[in-house]
């Protein structure tokens, strides 16, 4: 029986690494996994994990693939010896944290290129063959930051919101082609993601006003607390990917945690967005500015009990490690 061929981007660490070895070591021995990395010099941890799980010979291969480079994507596709990819996992991503005015133009461009355009490049490379064959699955690493805005994650959230629109639009089209696309919506995850977050807190004060600077460090403290309380292990998240992969009738979205669903329901229940904005501000910063309170009284803002509905500690950065320490 032919094995299911899976290609995963972003496998040097975190979710990509753990998903790759989870599939390669599956007792069914039904998967052939191509774990791709931007730099093959970083594959050591992947192979250590593969040995620890006793992945059978031939179940796992590594390929160089940089989602920022169409030629690199095409070259990786050509090195898949089976001549097809049954399951494509778009997992590579970058983060960017800080006040918007403090972010460099190159850093902003990098996040959008990797998170959005990089995913488009992968889909352009692999979807046509899936459509021709009338079968295939695409799993995209989504985020609660793609479903609700998080302060100081403006560009990161913008990139993940873009993925939501991209994937939802494609899912509508792909129904008659026999190709299923699912977003795996992650909350905080114990990974090295923060090491890849572009932007240094030490540079923030020179690029923003003192009030925003103060709010930024309020956010960092809050984020660290949420991470301690709510972060999942990548192994746990990998199981959600496996659930989506094996589902007879996959849905568009799978959530790795239910912790953020009350806030998401709040957004849906109030299309104006006022309730969510006020509740999120209160949740992160512990206060509601007078202007926001006045707006709520005028009609539609978050009233008493909105904080309880959202749930304390229900806000955090998707796939973030401990926030950087405040400069001394």
UniProtKB/Swiss-Prot annotation:
Keyword Cell membrane annotated: no
Cited InterPro entries: 17beta_DH, NAD(P)-bd_dom_sf, Sc_DH/Rdtase_CS, SDR_fam
Binding site for substrate: 143
CDD domains: type1_17beta-HSD-like_SDR_c
Chain residues that bind NADP(+): 10-38, 66, 160
Enzyme class: oxidoreductase
Task performed by this protein: Favors the reduction of estrogens and androgens. Converts estrone (E1) to a more potent estrogen, 17beta-estradiol (E2). Also has 20-alpha-HSD activity. Uses preferentially NADH.
Designated name of the protein: 17-beta-hydroxysteroid dehydrogenase type 1
Species of the source: Homo sapiens
